[in-house]
Amino acid sequence: MSLISAVEDRDIHNIGKTSGGGSRTSSITSSKKSLKHGSKSLRKPKVYQTTGEPLSREALYKAKLKYGVYQSPAQSYSIGVSDAHAASDKAANLAHDNQTTVEAYKRMFIDPNATKAASKMGPKVVRNNSITSATSKTSKESQTKRKSKESPGAAASKAYSMTMETTSLSSQTNSRSYSITSASSVLSGASGSFNSTVNPKPKTLNLEKVLVGAEKKAESRIKERWEPEKTNFQYGVKTDEHGNLNQFSFSNEMMNNIMAKVDAPKAQDLQKVKKVSAEKEAKSMKFALGAANAVKDMHPGADIDKSIALKAQKRETYLSQLTSQQVLTLARANVDRQLDIIEKSDMHRKLFTNMEYNKAAVAVAQSNHQKKTEFHNKINMGGGLFLSPEDITKIASGLISPVLGEVSERAEAQRAMDEEIAERTEAYNKSLNEWETMERSIISNDAKVLTTTANRHQTEKKTSQEKIKASFDALVARMDTKVAERETLLEDTKNKEIEFKKQMQQELKDEKARLDQDLEEWGKKCEQDITEARKEQEELLKPYHDDLANAEAEHKTLVEERDAINAEISRLQDAIVDHKRKISGYGNDLDAQKNRNIREDDKLLELGQTKESLESHLNDDVIILANKAKEQAELSTKEARLKQLEVDSLINERKSELNATEIELKKEKLNLLEAMKDVASARGDDKIAEEKVKKLIGMTSEEYLTQNKSVEKNVEDLPTQLEKIEEGDELKKEEIVGAETKNSGGDGVPVSTGAKEAAETSSAVQTKEPEEKISIGNKSSGKEDANDCESAEHSKEISVSQKAGNNKSLGVSPDSLEHTFSGFSQGSSIEDDQDAISNQEKK
């Protein structure tokens, strides 16, 4: 059994057609292609990515290029033609067809994109010559190709680039020449200007820059094709192997060394010689370029050296002879000589035209054939391994026999498994038949059971329906009797409710009349108290307008009182907010109670509550209304108190301003007395003029000073009096709070009269003068005690009436309680103060 098939006929045909230079590599690749397992035809490779999608055309092309499907650059020919038989004829034809005129070297095949770009720029645009670097990255093979394809004036252009440029050419072409291509482009422009008769065509378009760019692009493309980047593909997946594809590319030098059988040291010496010559050429070009750049900016009319003029003249004559017949013949001779050199240098590659080389090759082949007799009737496995067909069959049997044994074992196991499957299917079919018979019997039995159960259910249903109907009739009769009893009870409760509502309305009217009478009496009492307080204030305010010290003390006390009033205002505002919140809560409770009454009315139809439960719920409603009326009364008192305090604060501010002006007046009088004393002392008098002092102040200086001393004593006694007054105020406030808590702790009846009287008395005490505050506080405390007694009696009466089910304050609303605040309950009015001041000044 052989693992290697014979070589196909088409591969043998390709092997016979290969040239001498590429015979070895092409035979290897063809033999590799022919080593296929079996004699099947080549199928199109199907390469997919990891995701299952096929690769792109570019990836397939690069993969084929990697594995040698296409002719790689390592197997191509750098010089000459592919067919060695027609090499000499092809060279002769090219030399004959190549015309040695300037017109023949126009580029006939130009990239259409380049022509489009140049035509867009327009014919009037003057293009500068391109500047290319002296050290080009092109390989030596591309340079030799370009040398063979250049015009006959290439050598002259090279010499021209190494010489100096004249001033006339520098004015026309403002560019530097760094390479042979740029020098040739400049030469073509200069020759056109010198010999216009030879080439009379007008210069319509300058494509030099475009062509140079196209040439660079072509060189880069050739380099990419010659040395492509190795993109490592393995069925579309990249690996970590990197490097160039042409790792073992056969260059021209390598092929020359292989065919000439040159040793390694000789090849190295040859490379060194070539490197030195290239460096010399580069240096000479550099020196020539420096010289040309040195004289390019010289003016044409300036005097120059004779030697330079002679060189320029020789150069002009040389340039004028470039297009002559002699130059053309010399150029043709140079081309022929160069072609002969190329043919002679490549004679060792021409296997079919060189008979001597063919004879030597046949001799070498015979000697190699004699040496290879040891590998007769053996197959080349590659890598220097030759095996006989017997060895290959042994290896194949050793590799395949274990596989065949495994196949036989698996076949036996499969047969046993098939037998077991057949037995299992037979047993399964038997059990399935038994199961089907059992199912049929079950279905028939179920049909019988269903009929019997249906009959039994019908009889049970009839009996149960009769029982339910009898029980339902009894329930309906029983519930009808209950409904009649509840309806009679409901009528009785409705009649009682109507009578109770009438009774409550009459009591509310009586209570409202009594409260109105109390309010009128209380208003009269308040007016009398206000008039008495005003009289007392007028009597007490007279002495304080005369004293400076007392005015200062009063100013301080008023400031303190203002702060206390502001604190009281803030506290009362908080209390008002609290009372409003409570009133809103009571309103919510009333709404809830109304909803509850509605629910209770509905429940009366179903449950039939008794009279006691209805009376208890109605009492709760009355209590909530009483609490609401109480909070509204307290709110009205607090609002009245707040307004009184605001007015008191305004009065105190006015009085503080008045006292400040009086203090300033007293200070000015003292300053006047001091100034008069200074004037008298300056004159030498011991006393001042008392008559002038009386006219200005209204009293003598001694009287004024004694009066000020008494004021100072009064000022010293004021703090103790103020402390006592503050203690009295605190006691009164505590008593008022206690009375309110007592009233609130009762059954919810508001005691508005006592609270208002306490507020009036406390406000009157705060605005009276410091000397009389203690006595006024005692009087007000007595009034408060009386009011507390009255409020206690009222609370007792109201509690008794509530127990009886009568509420006195049900019809009282916050709008019905009229405010009794007069606006000037504390302190004196501004007009009274002004009258007092005018009377004091008259005195």
From Swiss-Prot:
Transferase keyword on record: no
InterPro entries with a match to the protein in the record: Eisosome1 (IPR024527)
Superkingdom of the source species: Eukaryota
Modified residues (Phosphothreonine): 720
Biased composition (Basic residues): 33-46
Primary location: cytoplasm
Keywords assigned: Acetylation, Cell membrane, Membrane, Phosphoprotein
GO BP term, pick one: eisosome assembly
Residue positions where Phosphoserine is found in the record: 2, 88, 130, 182, 401, 584, 710, 763, 775, 816, 828-829, 838
Location of N-acetylserine modifications: 2
CC annotations in GO: plasma membrane
Compositional bias annotation for Polar residues: 127-137, 163-174, 798-810
Disordered: annotated span: 1-53, 120-174, 718-843
Subcellular location(s) per record: Cytoplasmic granule; Cell membrane
UniProt keyword RNA-binding, yes or no: no
Membrane topology category: Peripheral membrane protein
Biased composition (Basic and acidic residues): 781-797
Similarity remark: Belongs to the EIS1 family.
Reported function: Required for normal formation of eisosomes, large cytoplasmic protein assemblies that localize to specialized domains on plasma membrane and mark the site of endocytosis.
Protein name: Eisosome protein 1
